[in-house]
Regions:
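Conserved Nudix-box catalytic region and its N-terminal flanking loop in Nudix hydrolases
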Residues: 42-85
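Glycine-centered C-terminal helix-capping/turn motifs at helix ends
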Residues: 88-89, 140
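Active-site-adjacent beta-strand/loop module that shapes the phosphate/pyrophosphate-binding cleft
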Residues: 44, 101-128
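A short coil-to-beta-strand element that immediately follows conserved catalytic motifs
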Residues: 90-100
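Acidic, metal-coordinating catalytic segment for phosphate/diphosphate chemistry
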Residues: 2-37
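Conserved beta-strand and immediately adjacent loop positions that scaffold enzyme active sites
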Residues: 37, 45, 137
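Nudix hydrolase/Nudix homology domain
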Residues: 2, 59-60, 112, 118, ...
Length: 165
C-alpha cells in the first residue's frame, strides 16, 4: 500500500461518512479510520506522548504523535501539521521526513481497523516540547522500548514500517 492507495481510500470514505461543519470526515461511529502515526527521533531516541483523558481512544497510554486523516491533503503535510499542533515542533527543527509503508491494524477491543500511515521525523536538535490537550506528559525512549505494556498496541510495528523503506 502506498500514499495513492491511502488517498483513494480516504476519498471513498469521504463519500459515505458524515462530515463535521468544517468539512472534515467524521470517523466517530465507523469501524475503519485512516491515521498518521509520527515518530519524532533525535539522538537515537523517540519522543512519546501520554494520551490525556480528553481523547477518544487509548487514554493514559503512551503513543507517537497521531491524528485522523480527515481531509484530502498530502500525508507529509498532515504529519507536519499534527507534529506542530501536538508538540510545538516547527519545520525549522526538522532534518528529514520518512514516510513508512501504510498498513491496516485491526483493534477488536474497540471494533475499529486503523489504516496506519507511519512517519519518522528526524530532528536537528532536541526541541522544547509544548503539549496540547491531547497529551499530559512526554518522554524520550530508546526504539526497543516501543512495545512496553503502557504503550498503544503494535507501536513498534508502526516504527518498523518506516525502517523498511
Amino acid at each position: 500500500m502506498d500514499e495513492a492507495d491511502v488517498i483513494s481510500k480516504l476519498e471513498a470514505l469521504g463519500k459515505k461518512l458524515p462530515h463535521f461543519s468544517d468539512g472534515r470526515i467524521n470517523y466517530t461511529n465507523t469501524d475503519y479510520a485512516p491515521v498518521i502515526c509520527v515518530f519524532i527521533r533525535f539522538d537515537n531516541q523517540i519522543l512519546l506522548l501520554k494520551r490525556s483523558g480528553k481523547v477518544s481512544n487509548y487514554k493514559g497510554k503512551w503513543n507517537a504523535i497521531t491524528g485522523f486523516i480527515d481531509k484530502p491533503e498530502p500525508l507529509k503535510e498532515k504529519a507536519l501539521g499534527e507534529v506542530e499542533e501536538e508538540t510545538g515542533i516547527t519545520k525549522e527543527l526538522i532534518k528529514e521526513v520518512i514516510l513508512g509503508t501504510p498498513y491496516e491494524l485491526p483493534d477488536d477491543e474497540i471494533n475499529k481497523t486503523w489504516l496506519v500511515c507511519p512517519f519518522v521525523i528526524e530532528l536537528n536538535s532536541r526541541p522544547k516540547i509544548k503539549l496540547d490537550f491531547e497529551s499530559t506528559e512526554y518522554k524520550w525512549i530508546k526504539p526497543e522500548q516501543l512495545n512496553a505494556p503502557d504503550t498503544v498496541r503494535d507501536l513498534g510495528k508502526s516504527y518498523a514500517a518506516c525502517l523498511k523503506t
